[in-house]
Amino acid sequence: MAFQLSPGVLTKEQDLTNVVPAVATTIGGISGDFQWGPAHEIVAVSSENNLVERFGKPTSSVYYDHMVASSFLAYGSQLLTIREVGAAARNAVSTGTAVIIKNRGLYDENYASGQGSVGPWAAKYAGTLGNALKVEIADITSASGLSVGSTTITAAGSGYSAATVTFSDPTGVTPANGGITATGTVALSGNNVQSITITNPGYGYTSAPTLTIGGDGSSATATATLQTAWTYKDQFDFTPTTTTHAKNNGATYDMVHVIVIDETGAISGTAGTVLEKFAGLSKASDARDDLNQTNFYKNVINDRSEWIYWMDYPTTVTSTSGSAWGSSSAGGTRFETLSGSAAGDVSTSLGSGVDAAPATADLQSGYGLFANDELVDVNLILNSAHATAVGDYIIDNVAEIRKDAMVFISPQRSAVVNNEGSESTSIISTSDLNAYTRSSY
């Protein structure tokens, strides 16, 4: 062992074979045209599989930018990806005129209070892929036994100037402890009963109810036919009745189930595939779950769904049955229940989604999100197969501003594809190459 008793130089040998040097991390960035995903928003992607999960698969019309991103991820593990869409792009919606919702921030700003007038749901992102979605929501009326689907007049009777109809209670239960009696109105033709309109299909029936027609006439009779139970009832372990939070507040019938289906197979490859489902959510705006997190169905769908946004409350409800959806559960309210068909008349197929390729200005706007080096860490900026004006924009307005990132601009496809032996000459002589700003970045 060496000792130093006075100032001098001490020489030591150290084995560095067990030292693993730190590897510099490179972060890529790209703005482009992708099939799916949030638009004009930076999303960190870590792998090729992750790229497909967030932005969809490449298609025959949308593949250049996906391939560039995929190639980078074959070597790197961090790619900041921005999807941009054209002005004509639209999210698929339940009904009405489709809207464009680029990302969650714009949703919160413009549609979170139900301003869209497009029905209860919209696809999470713009594009035709959203047209494959079907959304169903069920409460106790559609997931608890059968409901009255139709009536048949078996005898028109005579002498009626006014008539009423009553339905017997669900077999074996009473409205207070397990079912709701159906209701309806009678239409006359002359002095005869012509038809019965169901105003509330009820629920909890195991056999068809008995119909009794009253009024100032006589001899009119009718029968009821039950409709099929909710198609997706078996996807859930329990009937949506009342949540614990609502029960503690004295409220009832606030619970709903929501399920999202790939109706056409365009997403999963198999029509009818269940994409996601949410059990035991609440109609109450103040609802909390067992972990004290929001359980209001609107909030849960917006925060956790990968496929849809809430856009409005359903209109097919029995308005006379209780408080509106979105009310507080305080004060022991009974919430309105769904009405209409066996599925609560809330099976919604989304449509009117539109794909639209981004224009040059859209792509420039996307790359502009990389300009602030204090907010975004990026080292390598990929231009893909964009117009010369986009590459120039990246150089002048991103790289030259940041001064810490390199820009990678690909040659024009015509210069390198089917041009064997002349690639370098074509690249150097191309007018596009000469048009770019000269920069050390």
What residue ranges belong to the model's regions?
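A glycine- and small-residue-enriched flexible loop/hinge signal that marks low-structured segments
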Residues: 1-145, 225-441
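Conserved, function-critical positions that sit in or immediately flank catalytic
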Residues: 145-228
